[in-house]
């Protein structure tokens, strides 16, 4: 859904014709909102029980200002989505070059969970399975992505925080072999334990 550019020249003609006096950014967001609403309505018209959702960037500032996606509106208002799943692919110790820890896992999860949300909309999180072994590019790399249980720790954190679930990007990364094969196996085992898979009731 991201436009090929944020340059004003991209949609000058359409904006001049249909902008209606709105600020350009507001007009673009309104168009995206209309698109999401119509897709949601079309899905429900064909199959009411189908679940429709969107997985935006974990950085909601970028969603709003660069992709013209008003995710806060979709979360708080019925008729846009059934769920939102932000792509939170950073670790617990992630820091930016300027030292900011805003996007460290727990911090950004709490930021999302604090957003107003309608009861009809679920909030789950996308976790970066592809980061295992390779790291997340943090300015202060901590080695957490080589622990063998980072995804499991995240799954537990989300459960404690009251999130509605999680998904892995990409699930296939856990079975890709290569230099991190043993680490991936450890992550799979830890995830299974965190999810109670293969355990029997006492």
Feature locations, PLM:
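Polysaccharide-binding and catalytic clefts of secreted carbohydrate-active enzymes
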Residues: 1-73, 77, 89-90
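Substrate-binding cleft of secreted/luminal carbohydrate-active enzymes
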Residues: 76-201
